[in-house]
Design a protein with these regions (language model features):
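Acidic, metal/ion-coordinating pockets
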Residues: 12-359
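Bacterial N-terminal signal peptides
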Residues: 1-7
């Protein structure tokens, strides 16, 4: 099935911008901060306000939804079920697509998985990775996104579901190279301009990818994938743009929004990708990676009565002023320094957008 994100102008638009975010989570501390006892409801206004311009500037914005909208009772770790008001905030932030295959997909069993899919549909958010049944999978996978004259295939897989069985007829895509091979072949048959694969993989809190991640990434590249994006470690991992082979592997974007406050886990990165389509003399278009960069964002807790959560875009001097208090300022600076030192050392051809603009 094809979903049109935006129209293509007759002027011959030949570039497409994508933004990828890491893990969207909802811990108990986040729910407590958002709860309004006077209204008996949850208020997430402002959580994403600082990074909205980054998200909304993209033609397509994609994130990893690492929770369910399984209904009450609302719970955080270890089995997540977030208030529906949080979904409204995600939509308002500007996200277009959520990938849903991860180790928390069936935290609320079959009913939670299916309710999550219904809520995403009601909100007008596209999704892939989990399915109500086999027919749903066959009709909607790979997910094809159309924008500005581009057709993009999106695939999504997880290493597991925390030992919770996926109840029939539900489906959660596992990392199975035999099945992935078939899915990538199907994507090629759909004649899309680029194939994007998002994996939930790796070791939690480890900054370097393990051998399994590297092997699966290499396998997918050999089968025609152009972009591979990872989640699950909850910390940043390296980003490799192979200009010669024209492909990109980002092993982990870290936490986008969560209640985790430990070092390396209290923020993450947004990935900015520009695809360019060139029309050859024979009329056969060729799509390449024209530009790749990242932006850091940090999760701040405000000094208000609720200790509200706010995303702070690193590099924006106005938003950084919102980080007040000596302890918060110290944590903010620590995250920036840790992230820059690590990514400057490990990344290949992927730099920070804010610093590149200053240069």
């Amino acid at each position: 099935m094809v979903f049109v994100m935006s129209a293509w102008s007759a002027s011959g638009q030949d570039s497409l911008t994508l933004v990828f975010a890491g893990d969207i989570m909802q811990h108990e501390s986040q729910m407590k901060a958002a709860f309004d006892p006077a209204k008996g409801s949850y208020d997430y206004r402002g959580v994403f306000e600082g990074v909205k311009p980054w998200i909304q500037s993209a033609d397509i914005a994609i994130a990893n939804l690492e929770l369910t909208f399984g209904g009450k009772p609302y719970t955080g770790y270890p089995q997540f079920s977030a208030p529906d008001e949080f979904l409204a905030a995600i939509k308002d932030a500007g996200f277009d697509v959520l990938v849903t295959a991860n180790n928390h997909s069936v935290d609320r069993g079959r009913s939670g998985l299916e309710r999550t899919l219904r809520r995403l549909d009601s909100a007008g958010l596209l999704h892939t990775g989990t399915f109500a049944d086999t027919l749903d999978f066959l009709n909607h996978y790979p997910l094809i996104l159309e924008a500005r004259g581009f057709r993009i295939s999106l695939l999504n897989y997880t290493y597991g579901t925390n030992g919770i069985a996926v109840r029939r007829p539900n489906r959660v895509n596992p990392i199975d190279t035999a099945q992935i091979r078939k899915d990538l072949a199907r994507a090629r048959q759909q004649k899309t301009d680029a194939v994007v694969v998002v994996f939930h993989w790796g070791d939690e809190y480890q900054q370097l990818p393990n051998r399994a991640q590297q092997e699966v990434a290499g396998f997918c590249l050999s089968q025609g994938a152009k972009l591979i994006i990872g989640s699950h470690p909850h910390v940043l991992q390296p980003m490799y743009w192979n200009r010669d082979q024209d492909n990109l592997v980002v092993y982990s974007l870290g936490n986008f929004i969560s209640g985790q406050r430990a070092r390396y886990r209290n923020g993450g990165a947004l990935l900015h990708v520009t695809l360019r389509k060139d029309h050859t003399a024979e009329g056969t278009p060729r799509t390449t990676l024209a530009d790749v960069s990242y932006s850091l964002s940090w999760v701040n807790r405000l000094p208000d009565s609720r200790r509200s959560f706010r995303l702070v875009p690193v590099g924006d001097p106005v938003d950084s002023l919102a980080v007040t208090g000596s302890n918060s300022r110290a944590l903010y600076k620590e995250f920036i320094n840790d992230s820059r030192v690590f990514l400057d050392r490990e990344n290949r051809n992927v730099g920070e957008r804010a610093r590149r603009k200053r240069d």
